[in-house]
Amino acid sequence: WRTGSDQYGDPVPNSMYRYLWSNGPKECLEFADYSFDEHFGNPIPSFPPREVLYDYILGRVKKGNLKDKIRFNNNVTNVTYNGNNFEITSLDKKNNKFSKDVFDYVVVATGHFSIPFIPEYPGMKSFPGRILHSHDFRDAEEFRGKNVIVLGSSYSAEDVALQCHKYGAKSVTIGYRHNPMGFKWPNGVKEVFHLDRLEGSKAIFKDGHEQEADAVILATGYLHHFPFLSEDLKLKTGNRLYPPKLYKGVVWQNNHKLLYLGMQDQFHTFNMFDCQAWFARDVVMGKIKIPNNSEIEKDINKWVSMEEKLENPDQMIDFQTEYTKELHDLSDYPKIDFELIRKNFKEWEHHKVENIMTYRNKSF
């Protein structure tokens, strides 16, 4: 349960915590070519804990015999493009040895939930309690008997707040900036508008609410962070369903040999990543031809324009389902029942609205 730096001095990328369970139904994220039933041999609940999901992912890795094809404990430190190919510098961390390689294509699949965004609030430096980002949250039992402030209004804020409540926090106050999550919270959990400042051990909110605090947990999101890429290759975006400058959400508009995977905010996860990977594979192999810049711009603008009009979770689910469906149809990825996934996602969202404490008890 390491936080901070790993054994090599690099930031720990892991944002998981001890009692983490899937917050979305497994039926919506299953690999099309490797089912949960195939892996476990028996049906399992729709919302498995992290250890079960990890075991499932490892099973798919073993089935594909992938480990022998990966150089582990290597840190890519620099990527540049010389007009023909990519020059990559990497560090073998185990042997502390640098090497340089040349590649025709680069795929960036580093994720974007590892480098925390940490806002500043007046009074943070003099706050006598504990302040941490949800990235470093590991065990809710640490907050038993404490007054906890959680800042944020997305999945991390939701789950961290409920974890602290379940494991005995004295109170949990969730501060949101724009819109509240609006669930029917249990007694001891409440949402208030936007932290203004900390005064001693007291949190002062912009709606006038005041709350004694022992700990402040910043569930304030993450940064797309690519320190190894030269500036002309970096995707610069916030967390959104369709990042700009990516054709089909994958191909870098300014250099078609640079491919990004998994850079979107996500309802679909494993199946979307797979559809992106199949699409990227076919681009590299020349099976999919990239159109001219005018067509690329038109396609990107179409998706970005649709994204900007989304108003609620059901519309967002529809948007990402249609995006993943389009990618799927461009390759030979195995069949996916997108309409069933769409239906399950919407039921899941409605179950959360009905009872945020019990939605994981449902089966799909």
Model regions: which residues?
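Glycine/threonine-rich phosphate-binding loop and adjacent beta-strand/alpha-helix elements that clamp
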Residues: 7, 16, 224-288
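Glycine-rich dinucleotide-binding loop and its adjacent helix/turn
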Residues: 36-39, 49, 53, 99, ...
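C-terminal, flexible cofactor-proximal segment of oxidoreductases
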Residues: 257-364
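Short glycine-/small-residue-rich Rossmann-like dinucleotide-binding loops
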Residues: 92, 111-112, 136, 217, ...
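Glycine-rich active-site loop/strand segments that organize a redox cofactor
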Residues: 1-59, 247-253, 290, 296-317, ...
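Feature captures the FAD/FMN-dependent oxidoreductase FAD-binding
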Residues: 42-110, 114
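A conserved short coil-to-beta-strand element within the FAD-binding core of flavoproteins
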Residues: 72-87, 137, 177-202
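Core beta-strand elements of the Rossmann-like FAD/NAD(P) dinucleotide-binding domain
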Residues: 94-105, 144, 206-215
